[in-house]
Every structure is written in C-alpha cells, then in structure tokens.
Amino acid sequence: MKFVGAHVSAAGGVDQAVLRAHEIKATAFALFTKNQRQWKAAPLSTESIDKFKKNCEIYGYGPAQILPHDSYLINLGHPEEEALEKSRAAFLDEMQRCEQLGIELLNFHPGSHLKKIDVDKCLQRIAESINITLDKTQNVTAVIENTAGQGTNLGYRFEHLAAIIDGVEDKSRVGVCIDTCHTFAAGYDLRTVEDCEKTFAEFDNIVGFQYLKAMHLNDAKSELASRVDRHHSLGQGNIGKVPFTYIMQDIRFDGIPLILETINPDIWPEEIAWLKSQQTQ
C-alpha cells in the first residue's frame, strides 16, 4: 500500500497538521513539531500530545504514515565543537518530541562541513551525532535525507549516505529519505523508466532498499547535476511525471511516507489524487 501526502502546516498546534492532511485526502503527512527556524521552542503540552494522538486515531494515521522534519538550523556534522553540541542538543529535543507524539521517524538533512573539515570527518561526525541521540531515545528512527549538494551540504552522493549508516551502531534505527528533486540535482537522472531503473539500482547497490524509510516527491526547477535545490510541482519541472508513476507502481516504495514538498499547496489535493491514480494505470 502506498501512503501519499504532503508537508502540512502545524500552525495552531501539531494536532492541526493531522486535520490539514485529512482535508487534502492525504494518506501520509509531514510536519515540523516545532518552529523550524528557531533553536528553542516550548515543550509540547500534554493537551497538544493527546490531541495529536486522538486526531491520528480518528483519521487513520499510523506511525508509518507520519514523517516529521527537524529544524533547518541543525548541522550534525558541524566542524566547531560548540556549534556541534548545540545542534546535537536540538536534534535530541526533536527526537524526544517524536517519542512523546508516538512518531517513529525523524527526517533530517545530514550536515555541512563549511569548508573547515574534510568530507570523511564530517560524515563521521554525523554518524557520531546519530549514535549519541539514539542512545538517549527509543523507538524513533533517524531518517537521513539525501541533498542536492548545495554549498557544503553533504548527502548528495549515495556513498555519503552509506558512509553515515556504516558509522551508526544501531542499524535498526537509521534509514534514508530520498528526495526526487535532490536526487536529480545531485546528478542521478530520473526522467525515463530506464533512468529510474539505473538510479534505484545504484541506490540499492550502495545503500540498500532495506534502509529506504520515506520519500519526498518533488519535480525540479533546477537542472540535472546542477547541485541546486529548487522544487517544482509534479510534471512542471525538468524531471517530468515518469518517475512518479514509476514509484507509485513499484512495490519497493510501499508502506513508507511519500511526501510532496511541491511549491503550490493549492494543488496538493490534485497532485495526491493523480499519484493515487497512477497505481492502477
């Protein structure tokens, strides 16, 4: 079964995200459990946690259908100790929020070396950050998102993801989220069925499909191998609709959140309906 949705707003409380997902007929959703552009946030109230769980129960969203995203400020591979510790503390808080809400996945961008340490050292730091956080939490899987490779961001090569996973001690609690826009911008083509076969075979060979825990379904304004992260609505960018049909018809993508982060929320209901329709083509 395919779980399809979008990254919805949690304005007014995390429980409201569930209602917004239901309104667009989503069978999965992503959200921020706190303000993504601030370091500090008030703890989740018991009332907010209870409302979130109740709404998920009412509208039929289980843990496999929910993909929270952490703060954009966090850099788990930061080259400077003080900033690294700040990021690690914030990441732990994000993981603990997921624990409180009964969510089993936390999606995050791996980190950036900022031209101050080498790639391998940065990847090692990211793995260490994950290990520290997993030791202090239970039941939540750290889901590494591949990146477009803008600036000094790592995670744009499948080898980066594999290296991080290799350094994580508890392999049962680490996984990957593949963003189609990022994948394309990083140089992995997806425009034809043959491209999809090749790219996902490479992913399986280097990382392994057993680690695929989620996907972000986005077309791209950016060009192939541009290392520029610019999302577009499905079928309106440089990728086209082929890979989205491919994903919807391939059982390897069953049972995980497939999340839109496309640029026009007004057409999310149509995009979700179209994706669902592709399963039976």
From Swiss-Prot:
Signal peptide: none annotated. Zn(2+) 1 binds at residues 69, 109, 145. InterPro entries: AP_endonuc_2, AP_endonuc_F2_Zn_BS, Xyl_isomerase-like_sf, Xyl_isomerase-like_TIM-brl. Binds 3 Zn(2+) ions. Zn(2+) 2 binds at residues 145, 179, 216, 261. SUPFAM superfamilies: Xylose isomerase-like. The keyword Aminoacyl-tRNA synthetase does not apply. PROSITE patterns: AP_NUCLEASE_F2_1 (PS00729), AP_NUCLEASE_F2_2 (PS00730), AP_NUCLEASE_F2_3 (PS00731), AP_NUCLEASE_F2_4 (PS51432). Keywords: DNA damage, DNA repair, Endonuclease, Hydrolase, Metal-binding, Nuclease, Zinc. Its EC number is 3.1.21.2. Gene3D superfamilies: Divalent-metal-dependent TIM barrel enzymes. Its cofactor is Zn(2+). It is an enzyme of class 3 (hydrolase). GO terms for biological process: base-excision repair. The keyword Hydrolase applies. Disulfide bonds: none annotated. Zn(2+) 3 binds at residues 182, 229, 231. It catalyses: Endonucleolytic cleavage to 5'-phosphooligonucleotide end-products. One of its GO terms (molecular function) is zinc ion binding. HAMAP family: Nfo. NCBIfam families: nfo (TIGR00587), PRK01060.1-4 (NF002199). Endonuclease IV plays a role in DNA repair. It cleaves phosphodiester bonds at apurinic or apyrimidinic (AP) sites, generating a 3'-hydroxyl group and a 5'-terminal sugar phosphate. Belongs to the AP endonuclease 2 family. This is Probable endonuclease 4. It comes from Proteus mirabilis (strain HI4320). The lineage of its organism: Bacteria, Pseudomonadati, Pseudomonadota, Gammaproteobacteria, Enterobacterales. The gene is nfo.
